[in-house]
Each structure stands twice: as C-alpha cells, then as structure tokens.
C-alpha cells in the first residue's frame, strides 16, 4: 500500500491511515478528488492526496504480469483488460476525434502547463520534495546519483509545437490515431 508507506515515510504517526487508488492513469487526480470529497462531506479535516503513475508498462507487450487476469472475465469479456492506448483508439474512432484535433489539444495542454508553472499558479498547492535522481550515461553505461528538489511537474515540454506533434508516429501503427 504505497499510500500507507508514504504516510509513515513522511513521519506521520502509525494511527494515520493511508490508502492506494489503483488506476493506470489519473490515480493522483482521483486520490485528490477522493480527499476533497472527504473534506467537503466533513468526514476528514486534513487529507494528503497524490499519485504514482507509470503508463510505460501497461501496453500489452510490456505489461506487468504480476497482476493476474481472471480467466472467466477473459472468456466472457475479452476486452476487459484493454490498455489505455487501445481505449484511446476506440474513443478517437467513436467520437471522430482526428489526429489534428488531438495534436491541437496536446499543444494547448503543454502551453497551459507552461503558463501555469511560469505564473506560479500551483506554487501554493505543491510541496517541494527532496529525492535522489538516478542518471545514466548512455555512452559509458555509468550510473550517477544526484540529490534534487522536485518543485513542479517535470514532464511538460514548453518547446512543443504543432509541427513536432504532427511528426510523431502513432504508437499503434500507421492506421491508428494515438
């Protein structure tokens, strides 16, 4: 239970509960929404919400195999374990969302993130976290460790442009959208 481990690791006493929300995408957002609801319903006064996301290992060929798949479900509903990429393809097809529209939305998202970070919109909501970053020199195969302080989401790309997005190849092959 990563939520419980995080609570204890942060120095909270053992009587403070922790829980995990398992979603392959948006678990952090869901954890925050659950916490906000607990406060709104006056069930809790203080809640810490966060997430641990890793969508790099949910595609079928790289799937984490430690989670079992129910054979009866697989027989009766074979798409029950559909990956997020496959799900996105279904949504894009069903609602006729073109590659161009997806690229425009992705660009807008990158720009909004950059703007919000640049203007400090989330500074009061994000607590800096000190951690150790592992770096690997590809040429020498040497591994280095660096103490860092994470103060914002590091994954946005402010230099993103529509041309760069349109040049990205679809993950599932040429006939796909995503």
Describe every region a protein language model picked out:
Residues 22, 45, 70, 86-89, ...:
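Acidic side chains
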Residues 101-178:
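N-terminal extracellular/periplasmic Venus flytrap/periplasmic-binding protein-like
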Residues 19, 51, 59, 104, ...:
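Proline- and acidic/polar-enriched loop/turn elements at helix boundaries
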Residues 1-45, 79-86, 158-178:
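Conserved catalytic cysteine-centered active-site region
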Residues 36, 41, 45-94:
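Flexible glycine-/small-residue-enriched beta->alpha junction loops
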Residues 5, 23-52, 92-122:
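Active-site-proximal alpha-helical scaffold in enzymes
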Residues 1, 57-63, 140-142:
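Short acidic, glycine/serine/threonine-rich loops at helix termini
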Residues 20-21, 72-74, 98:
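A short, structure-level motif marking secondary-structure boundaries and short turns
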């Amino acid at each position: 239970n990563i939520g419980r481990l995080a609570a204890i690791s942060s120095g909270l006493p053992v009587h403070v509960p922790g829980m995990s929300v398992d979603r392959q995408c948006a678990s952090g957002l869901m954890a925050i929404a659950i916490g906000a609801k607990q406060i709104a319903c006056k069930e809790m006064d203080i809640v810490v919400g966060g997430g641990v996301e890793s969508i790099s290992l949910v595609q079928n060929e790289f799937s984490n195999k430690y989670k079992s798949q129910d054979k009866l479900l697989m027989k009766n509903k074979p798409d029950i374990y559909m990956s997020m990429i496959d799900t996105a393809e279904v949504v894009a097809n069903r609602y006729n969302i073109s590659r161009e529209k997806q690229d425009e939305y992705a660009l807008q998202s990158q720009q909004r993130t950059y703007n919000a970070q640049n203007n400090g919109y989330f500074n009061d909501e994000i607590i800096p976290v000190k951690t150790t970053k592992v770096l690997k020199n590809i040429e020498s195969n040497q591994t280095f460790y660096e103490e860092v302080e994470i103060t914002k989401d590091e994954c946005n790309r402010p230099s993103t442009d529509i041309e760069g997005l349109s040049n990205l190849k679809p993950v599932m092959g040429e006939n796909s959208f995503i």
